[in-house]
């Protein structure tokens, strides 16, 4: 039992030593029906064994512009994604739509410029939250 505990501690320590800090910046402008809108923008990092990590969050400005930078320490490459919570084309009062956007792995370590994020185009990952 002690050997198993010792081995687990050593492996965990090695994982922390091998983990490297990885950073991503994401910027863009939120658009609904050809108009710039404010929206809540959150940068996440997908984890397999534990809950996903929130890297950064902000409200886009009145012009819909946002820029987020986040970092995480991982042994393998991080898997960042963006969640935008908004009310573009939502029919029910008090409800919001949650749109998810994957960030290309080759953008890790740099800036991913999404330019215009057209929220009125539904994707398979969109969900309504009431």
Curated annotation (Swiss-Prot):
The keyword Oxidoreductase does not apply. Keywords: Secreted, Signal. GO terms for cellular component: cell surface; extracellular region. Residues 1-19 form the signal peptide. It is found in: Secreted. The keyword Secreted applies. Pfam families: TTR-52. Its main location: secreted. Belongs to the nematode transthyretin-like family. This is Transthyretin-like protein 15. It comes from Caenorhabditis elegans.
